[in-house]
Amino acid sequence: MAAVKISQKEADRLLNMLKHSLVSEINFPSKGDSTEFNVVGDQKQDLFAINIFRGKINSLKYNMGARIIKNGILLLELHINPSNIHINPDGEKITGSHWHLYSEEYGRLWAFPAEDIQNEQFTENTISFLNKFNVIDPPVIHYPPEL
């Protein structure tokens, strides 16, 4: 079965549109947990889910992803882990934290370094992710005391 794809033009439109959170606040996940909330774009049919997962063993490892609800396509991901290694389709190795941005050709398989990301800066990294996904009305995020 072929994977669901969208055109690059449509992906760019969805990535670049302004979005608003449908919830006013969320709790950042504790170790080994995830949390998810929805955001809406310019039109009500443009619905997205943002998921935040935090590692169980390494609490400095966490992932954030934004996907289209109607087809499950991941448009944007941020993987935060200083020892992470991702291999791009051309064989290039990306070490450390990195971004995935949807492309028509590769889906989410291509990564590029997240040079502006510091592992311990949970608040700033979450804001960077929401800004990159153009969420102009984000929820208030409550962080666990250990962060």
Label the model's feature ranges.
Residues 19, 23, 33, 53, ...:
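Short linear sequence elements within intrinsically disordered, low-complexity coil regions
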Residues 31-80:
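Amphipathic, interaction-prone secondary-structure segments
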Residues 13-15, 76-89, 131-139:
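A short, terminal or domain-edge coil/loop segment
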Residues 28-32, 138-147:
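Short glycine-rich, low-complexity/disordered patches
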Residues 1-47:
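Charge-rich, low-complexity N-terminal segments
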Residues 108-131, 136-144:
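Well-ordered alpha/beta subsegment
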Residues 63-116:
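An exposed acidic His-Trp-rich patch
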